[in-house]
Amino acid sequence: MAKDIGLDIPEPTKECDDINCPFHGELPVRGQIHVGTVVSAKMDRTVVIQQRREKLINKYQRYEKRQSKIHAHNPPCIDAKVGDIVTIAECRPLSKTKSYVVVKAEVKA
């Protein structure tokens, strides 16, 4: 049985025994929530999410494209793949570069 993490996100259908899973483990989530696309899933239980945005340049009244990459923990119950649109939530630092965990994955058609 999955626990409530405090967000309006449905519980995953699969079970896992990962201690760093916000639904089945001991990891609390707090802080920022981001949405992005998975660009790499080659690491063990880690995905790289690319987040794209547009920033207004006031002088020219035009937008420039910007992007950033965020490393996030990928629990086995969610198991996001490359190309999926995921929602990540901030948590305590899990490693040198990971401070986010995947809480929802939508399969891209």
Curated annotation (Swiss-Prot):
GO CC annotation terms, alphabetical: cytosolic small ribosomal subunit
**Membrane spanning residue stretches:** none
Q: How does it assemble?
A: Part of the 30S ribosomal subunit.
SUPFAM superfamilies from the entry?
Nucleic acid-binding proteins (SSF50249)
Stated family: Belongs to the universal ribosomal protein uS17 family.
- This one is known as Small ribosomal subunit protein uS17
Q: Give a GO biological-process term.
A: translation
What function does the entry list? Answer: One of the primary rRNA binding proteins, it binds specifically to the 5'-end of 16S ribosomal RNA.
- Keyword ATP-binding (UniProt): no
Protein's organism? Methanococcoides burtonii (strain DSM 6242 / NBRC 107633 / OCM 468 / ACE-M)
Q: Name one Pfam family in it.
A: Ribosomal_S17
Database matches in InterPro entries: NA-bd_OB-fold (IPR012340), Ribosomal_uS17 (IPR000266), Ribosomal_uS17_arc/euk (IPR028333), Ribosomal_uS17_archaeal (IPR019978), Ribosomal_uS17_CS (IPR019979)
